């Protein structure tokens, strides 16, 4: 399941984020690469321990955990703290699958979901599409600044070469309370239907029944 979430951050907020990011020292992006990815990856990143990157990453996590659509789709249990990357001058990251397990200060997490928060407007760079191969075929993603795409970490994906301009983004992984992608999809669809019916002031008893089904499925499928 691939979910696009628009306007997680406003244009003004993105501009403020970029001012802080652009002033930092960027390093070789292979810091977070697995052994097989190093030959395919050419980009720049902020060091994961950079204090500005850490603070902005926390701001992003706080925003996402307060976003109903993100929480509904991801059912987040634990984040790998957001990182920041930049592509320019032909830089690219060829097809790869993200590492299944990552180490955090609090221990190991299983990467169920990957997310990219775009911090450059699409008209400001040529190329740089996030191309994802999933069960529905190939999808090419290039969202407006402040918008986010969420997709299974098991997906084969790439960032195409940035031929002109600059593509800056935040990227992150997370472990979901529900490991199985198909089960997460069903729960998301059910939750979105419940929210839609609630907005339409549907019959109270039916909403209680549907909500009970949702929570009983979540209870059955979740791993904490």
UniProtKB/Swiss-Prot annotation:
Entry's EC annotation: 1.14.11.-
Protein name, per record: PKHD-type hydroxylase Sbal_3634
InterPro entries found in the cross-reference section: Oxoglu/Fe-dep_dioxygenase_dom, PKHD_C, PKHD_hydroxylase, Pro_4_hyd_alph, Pro_4_hyd_alph_FE2OG_OXY
Ranges where the Fe2OG dioxygenase domain occurs: 78-176
Keyword Iron: yes
Keyword Iron on entry: yes
Keywords: Dioxygenase, Iron, Metal-binding, Oxidoreductase, Vitamin C
Residues reported to bind Fe cation: 96, 98, 157
Organism superkingdom: Bacteria
Organism: Shewanella baltica (strain OS155 / ATCC BAA-1091)
Single GO MF annotation: 2-oxoglutarate-dependent dioxygenase activity
Annotated positions binding 2-oxoglutarate: 167
Co-factor remark: Binds 1 Fe(2+) ion per subunit.
PANTHER family (alphabetical): PKHD-TYPE HYDROXYLASE YBIX (PTHR41536:SF1)
Cofactor(s) of this protein: Fe(2+); L-ascorbate
A Gene Ontology BP annotation from the UniProt entry: intracellular iron ion homeostasis
